[in-house]
Amino acid sequence: MLTTAINGGIVVDVIRGTRHRRNLGIENGRIVEISETPLEAQEVIWADGLTVAPGFIDVHGHVDGNDYAGILSAYQGITTTVGGNCGCSPSSIGDFFRNQESLGFPVNQAMLIGHETALREEAGALDRYKPATEEQIQTMTQLARKALQEGACGISFGLDYVPGSSLDEVIALAQVCKEYDKICPVHTRLLTDKDMYSLYELFQVARKTGVHILISHFVYQYCNGLVEEGLRMVEKAMKENLDIQLDSGMYTNWTTYFNTATFDLQNIQNSHWRWDQMIVATGEHTGSVMTEELYYHMKEKHPCEAIICFERKEQEVYDCLVKPYVMPSTDIGAYAEGEGHPQIAGTYPRYFRKMVREKKLLTLEEAVYKATLLPARVFGFDQKGSIEKGKDADLTIFDPATIRDRSDYPHRGKPDAKPDGIPYVLVNGCLTVCNGEYTGRRCGRIIRK
């Protein structure tokens, strides 16, 4: 008898762009049967009236082994998360993988090796305002090769956070990534709030190396009136056969840590941000609006907290995510309960609510494809992203009519409020979310590339 059956649901075929009532049989963590008649199994999930989709793949997160972030990911239908983004990762990918395999995890994890916290720091290039030396670059390339051989799915960059990093060191590492046929996700370098050189820099890297580049959280980088121009530049580069794709969050208001170069006073002034555009997202001042006095207090006493910056150009989110080469992503971080940005619990429910149900910018099939098979193909996750016999049984079962985000900003509500409309999530065939509640099962696997 089958281990698990999902009967009566409307199954999304992301390969053909269709959906049909089908019944799924699962055994040993994989889909083994797709039937037009209901199936018997040890565990039967009745999904009448619900959509059965491949599990969502979050290409830009910072879960990195944090349990609560993993649980929040599962609540919003994510079954695979890519960590180590923005140049920030564990220094040893091999050690991280072994540790996570011994502990288990709520969702699957793939990891990037980070330019700043792993490669630069291990090579001794500790000053983020200075370029690495030739010797340090050579050390970084050796460390990168080791990480890629251990299964990292690429090299991530957070050029905003390391303003001193040279084009030479980025190109050297991108060449290593290309050697292994892996991807470079890049949080672009913004010198001002109107900086488009950041994109030209990436195009230059792509031309010189041929590496596959993923521009991280595109709207968060350019949502101050530059998205239209930025997309035009990207599409022109794609016509030159540069291998470029984008991911984007569902919010106009982004967050990062206070101790990064982003919140240097000079950068705040260059970006023309007002104090009242910044909200403290973590720690004892959670929900407080930034003031000059609070800024200096936190610089001295609380430099490691997260800050949300409000920019408010919502239409640019939709203009970006409607593009066929853009994937949704969360930028989820590892926060304590009740803290953080609403993206940690609301990104994918908000994506389906806004893009499909309310604004009708995407069909349901298109939206599911962009959250599943497209990222699986971009990262080469061959066993993920579609509902086919033999594929891993990563499945998200939701109601398109009721799916919605309930999370809010910390000065208004709960950033980690669970969404509505996602009753079941299976990770490698294990029922990880049942009736909207986490079951405690830790069936996520490490994805080595």
PLM region spans:
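N-terminal metal-binding scaffold of metallo-dependent hydrolase/deaminase domains
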Residues: 1-40, 367, 403-407
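Divalent metal-coordination and catalytic microenvironments
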Residues: 9, 24, 29, 49, ...
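Structural signature of the urease/amidohydrolase superfamily beta/alpha-barrel
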Residues: 29, 376, 382-407
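Divalent-metal coordination cores built from histidine and acidic residues
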Residues: 52, 69-156, 242
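Histidine-centered catalytic micro-motifs
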Residues: 55-65, 159, 184-190
